[in-house]
Amino acid sequence: ESAPWIKNYQLADIEPFTYTSRDGIKLHGYITLPPNYKDGEKIPFIIHPHGGPNARDYWGYNPEVQFYATRGYGVIQMDYRGSTGYGRKEMILANHQMGKKMQEDKYDALMWANDQGYVDMDNVCISGASYGGYAAMQAATKNPELFKCIIAYVGVYDLTSMDLRGLQWSEL
C-alpha cells in the first residue's frame, strides 16, 4: 500500500463528459461530485481550468480536485480548445483566442453542468494555476457576476512576456 492513510477517507468519483461550445465545437471534460452527493441536489461548484494552455486534464486522481469535492464542492475540469491530445484542428481553433473563445469554453462547461441540474449558480468559483490562473483573472474582469470567488495562483498575467525566455530582470 503506497498510501494507507487514504482508506480513511471517501474519495470522489471523476466522470468524463462531452459538451458543445456556443460556436458548435465538441469539447470534453471531467466532472467530480462530492462523495455524498444526492441526485437532484444543486451544490456549489468550482470551475478548474488546467494550466498551459498547451496541456490537458486527465481522468485520474487530482489532489486539488479531491480536496474540493470531499468538502462538498462539485468540480469541472474542461479541455477547452487548444488543449493537447485532440489534434491539429483543435489547436488551430485556439489561435488568438486567449481571453476570447477559449474563455467562453469554460463558461460553456459550467452551463453544461447547470443544465444537468448540478449547479447552485449563486455559489460558483473559478480556480486555476498558470494559464488556469490567467483564465480565473479573465473571469474576474469579463464575467464577475458568474463567480462568488476567484482563485488564481502562479498565473500568466502578462501575455506579452509569456513566451520570453531567460531572466526578465537585471540587477539594480
Region roles according to the model:
Residues 1-41, 63-66, 70:
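Non-catalytic accessory segments flanking enzyme active sites
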Residues 32, 48-49, 127:
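Short hydrophobic segments within beta-strands
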